[in-house]
Every structure is written in C-alpha cells, then in structure tokens.
C-alpha cells in the first residue's frame, strides 16, 4: 500500500518530533519547491534518494484504439525520476 499525503505527514511528524502542522508545512514546502523546479526545467536531486528532471516528449503519430484512426499527438513535457543508490540498495535487500 502506498502512503498518501496524510500518512506521509504523520510519519514525518513521528520521526522528526514535529507537530503534524509543522510536518505538513514541510511537506507542502517540498511539494512547492519540487513543482517549481520541474516547471522551470532545473530538475531536483536528493543524493542517494532520487533525481528528477523535466523531459520533452517529441510529437508523434498514434492511433485511436476504438476506431483505429491515425491521430497526431503533440509534443509535451513529462518528468523522469531515477532512483538513487540508497533507494536502490534498500529495495533490493
């Protein structure tokens, strides 16, 4: 089961001796910084945990699965997230 935001806030509050309000403020601040970094194209790296970068996806041709009609899919941006060494090690043990 994945943690949702309230689960994450509770865990951070427990582990760091913060109140839930303080932990929620920290999570919200991280979320804001993360989104700003992705929007600006700067990327974000937490050494050992993960790195994230904004990537451009090229325009391409696809097919409508219902009709089989060929459609043009415009270029867009996405996010590429790569696991860091600490995270990789933790999940393989």
From Swiss-Prot:
One of its GO terms (cellular component) is cytosol. SUPFAM superfamilies: IHF-like DNA-binding proteins (SSF47729). Keywords: DNA condensation, DNA-binding. Coiled coil: none annotated. GO terms for biological process: chromosome condensation. One of its GO terms (molecular function) is DNA binding. It holds the Pfam family Bac_DNA_binding. Disulfide bonds: none annotated. The keyword DNA-binding applies. InterPro entries: Hist_DNA-bd, IHF-like_DNA-bd_dom_sf. Homodimer. PANTHER family: DNA-BINDING PROTEIN HU (PTHR33175), DNA-BINDING PROTEIN HU-BETA (PTHR33175:SF3). Histone-like DNA-binding protein which is capable of wrapping DNA to stabilize it, and thus to prevent its denaturation under extreme environmental conditions. Belongs to the bacterial histone-like protein family. This is DNA-binding protein HB1. It comes from Bifidobacterium longum (strain NCC 2705). The gene is hup.
């Amino acid at each position: 089961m994945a943690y949702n935001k309230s689960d994450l806030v509770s865990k951070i509050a427990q582990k760091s001796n913060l109140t839930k309000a303080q932990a929620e403020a920290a999570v919200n601040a991280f979320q804001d910084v993360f989104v700003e970094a992705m929007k600006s194209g700067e990327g974000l790296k937490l050494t050992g945990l993960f790195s994230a970068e904004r990537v451009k996806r090229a325009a391409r041709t696809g097919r409508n699965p219902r009709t089989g009609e060929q459609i043009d899919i415009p270029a867009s941006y996405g996010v590429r997230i790569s696991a860091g060494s600490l995270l990789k090690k933790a999940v393989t043990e």
